[in-house]
Curated annotation (Swiss-Prot):
<dbReference type="InterPro" id="IPR011012">
    <property type="entry name" value="Longin-like_dom_sf"/>
</dbReference>
<keyword id="KW-0653">Protein transport</keyword>
<keyword id="KW-0333">Golgi apparatus</keyword>
<dbReference type="GO" id="GO:0000139">
    <property type="term" value="C:Golgi membrane"/>
</dbReference>
<dbReference type="GO" id="GO:0006890">
    <property type="term" value="P:retrograde vesicle-mediated transport, Golgi to endoplasmic reticulum"/>
</dbReference>
<dbReference type="GO" id="GO:0030126">
    <property type="term" value="C:COPI vesicle coat"/>
</dbReference>
<comment type="subunit">
    <text>Oligomeric complex that consists of at least the alpha, beta, beta', gamma, delta, epsilon and zeta subunits.</text>
</comment>
<keyword id="KW-0963">Cytoplasm</keyword>
<dbReference type="GO" id="GO:0006886">
    <property type="term" value="P:intracellular protein transport"/>
</dbReference>
<dbReference type="InterPro" id="IPR022775">
    <property type="entry name" value="AP_mu_sigma_su"/>
</dbReference>
<dbReference type="GO" id="GO:0006891">
    <property type="term" value="P:intra-Golgi vesicle-mediated transport"/>
</dbReference>
<protein>
    <recommendedName>
        <fullName>Coatomer subunit zeta-1</fullName>
    </recommendedName>
</protein>
<dbReference type="Pfam" id="PF01217">
    <property type="entry name" value="Clat_adaptor_s"/>
</dbReference>
<comment type="similarity">
    <text>Belongs to the adaptor complexes small subunit family.</text>
</comment>
<keyword id="KW-0813">Transport</keyword>
<keyword id="KW-0472">Membrane</keyword>
<comment type="function">
    <text>The coatomer is a cytosolic protein complex that binds to dilysine motifs and reversibly associates with Golgi non-clathrin-coated vesicles, which further mediate biosynthetic protein transport from the ER, via the Golgi up to the trans Golgi network. Coatomer complex is required for budding from Golgi membranes, and is essential for the retrograde Golgi-to-ER transport of dilysine-tagged proteins. The zeta subunit may be involved in regulating the coat assembly and, hence, the rate of biosynthetic protein transport due to its association-dissociation properties with the coatomer complex.</text>
</comment>
């Protein structure tokens, strides 16, 4: 019997292995101490890896963990050992792409903590109860911006404003030099 693609957890840890944003979708880790122990173990196992722009995959404690590092943030998606690695990798890619869009290409711990509500909304848009809903980063980011902060401008408008601000900064710098 085929089942829907599922995820056991999504973790966003800092460069020291501390929580930034985490969501667990199964009872594989029933207590907070079990969750923290799993996070520490995964972090230690992957810490020496050179995960860069591409996702890395590791079997860990009967689970498949797909991970990626961006600056001082470590992104992890965990699935069961029977889960398709490509699906887990696409969930990870969708999450990192959405975070990149929402944080306007400034993906670091400080910015992530300042926008933690939006990152948690991303997790809600990607997975519900362990079932994968969406893996396209731009779609996730647009949904988050649509029901994020009331009265906020749309993501497209934010991008235009950001481009104009950047152009103005470059023009000012060139005029002052």
């Amino acid at each position: 019997m085929e089942s829907c693609p599922s995820v056991k957890n999504i973790l966003l840890l800092d460069s020291e292995g501390k929580r930034v944003a985490v969501k667990y979708y199964t009872d594989d880790w029933p207590t907070l101490s079990a969750k923290l122990a799993f996070e520490k173990s995964v972090f230690v196992k992957t810490q020496k890896a050179t995960a860069g722009a591409e996702a890395e995959i590791v079997m860990f404690d009967g689970h498949i963990v797909v991970y990626k590092f961006i600056q001082d943030l470590h992104f992890f998606v965990t699935g069961g050992e029977e889960e398709n690695e490509l699906i887990l990798a696409s969930v990870l890619q969708g999450f990192t792409d959405a975070v990149d869009i929402i944080l306007r290409n400034n993906v670091d711990k400080r910015t992530a903590l300042e926008n933690l509500d939006l990152i948690l909304l991303c997790l809600d848009e990607i997975v519900d109860g362990g079932i994968v809903l969406e893996t396209e980063g731009s779609v996730i980011a647009e949904k988050v911006s649509a029901h994020g902060i009331e009265g906020a401008t749309s993501l497209a408008e934010q991008t235009i404003v950001q481009a104009l601000t950047t152009a103005r900064e470059h023009l000012t710098k060139s005029l002052l030099m």
